[in-house]
């Protein structure tokens, strides 16, 4: 153990760790739960700390010599080499102060080590005076939230969702001439093609991609430079813009300084907005995954209109059973994301005066929603969607036996007579054609001409 100090006094810290006194106090005071700060968020902190020191050098606030050590430490942090030094829990101060200081202390001590100094000495690099220069926890944490979410959505969610959309679009075209019975209210309905059914899934995902791309730019607004309450106290007038420009350059994402820092600190409306879009995506994916597992149900006593890949044994007691596991995993992800949105919505409503103090729980839930949806889309695509095949025999059986084909007769003999045909066929267990002929409403040739599934699906 080594001794480190802060404004409250001296405390022992594990000698092999780069974090310092404030991080150690957080470990003691907030031994709550198992949820630690996500590594993606820590990486984003590394990006903003690097941008801050680059800016402070340009503005003449930090010497290039000190900056070089800080920059090296930031680069190691960004690369994930220092992840073992970030043990703090989500359940801490609502501004994320302990995590901001955890980052400051780790960067400071690693920079000190690189400079040949003694860990905990705060020389030549001080965690507050140098690493945290021109910053506050109140503006760094929301900035890190935005960087994390924007990067994950850009580089993970959108690509994986696009691949799934493309696969379903390919299936829609592949199934374009396979006519099947439709279902509404879980009851038989008029026909459509399997391709048309899948085109609905494609449209849903297209709409979600549009919505995601629409809200993504709201994350580009950064709070950095607002410091404690949004006034920018203790910062150079050019710091906010220059730092945001550096973040944009480091990430390849067009981040910029928020025009109103008071809103950027006191509210997290952008996070609530993005989470709402992710919830909508979860609802869409839930519908798609549910449809696919129902359509694949069976193999002999279910709907069975499609066949999905057999990935693993499905039962420890029933030999040969194969379950729709990818759909089940996807739907569990969806309910988690919907729950996360509820948490984020409530947390987002709780800003008081100049600060919202629910930031860590909002960050944790949003990050989880993004990576769960990203991973689930990739998994569902690779292990289910690409291998979907039609069961033509089952499809034809249902189509030929459906009473709802009688709908095609509405314009010829009227709704009431068509309904009479359907009820007679159902009650007596005959075909629609047999019932129509027995009632004398149509001839055989008239029935065959009118009741043609191909004419009913607009292909």
UniProtKB/Swiss-Prot annotation:
Gene from which the chain derives: fumC
Stretch forming the signal peptide: none
Localisation per UniProt entry: Cytoplasm
Positions annotated as active site in the UniProt record: 185 (proton donor/acceptor), 315
CDD domains named among the record's database cross-references: Fumarase_classII
Gene3D superfamilies named among the record's database cross-references: Fumarase/aspartase (C-terminal domain), Fumarase/aspartase (Central domain), Fumarase/aspartase (N-terminal domain)
PROSITE patterns attached to this UniProt entry: FUMARATE_LYASES
Family: Belongs to the class-II fumarase/aspartase family. Fumarase subfamily.
Quaternary structure note: Homotetramer.
Protein name: Fumarate hydratase class II
Catalytic reactions on record: (S)-malate = fumarate + H2O
GO biological process, one term: fumarate metabolic process
A GO cellular-component term linked to this record: cytoplasm
Pfam families recorded: FumaraseC_C (PF10415), Lyase_1 (PF00206)
Enzyme class: lyase
Pathway recorded for this protein: Carbohydrate metabolism; tricarboxylic acid cycle; (S)-malate from fumarate: step 1/1
SUPFAM superfamilies tied to this protein: L-aspartase-like
Cited function: Involved in the TCA cycle. Catalyzes the stereospecific interconversion of fumarate to L-malate.
Keywords (A to Z) from UniProt: Cytoplasm, Lyase, Tricarboxylic acid cycle
EC number: 4.2.1.2
GO molecular function terms noted in the UniProt entry: fumarate hydratase activity
Misc: There are 2 substrate-binding sites: the catalytic A site, and the non-catalytic B site that may play a role in the transfer of substrate or product between the active site and the solvent. Alternatively, the B site may bind allosteric effectors.
Organism in which the protein naturally occurs: Coxiella burnetii (strain RSA 493 / Nine Mile phase I)
Positions bound to substrate: 95-97, 126-129, 136-138, 184, 316, 321-323
Site-annotated residues for Important for catalytic activity: 328
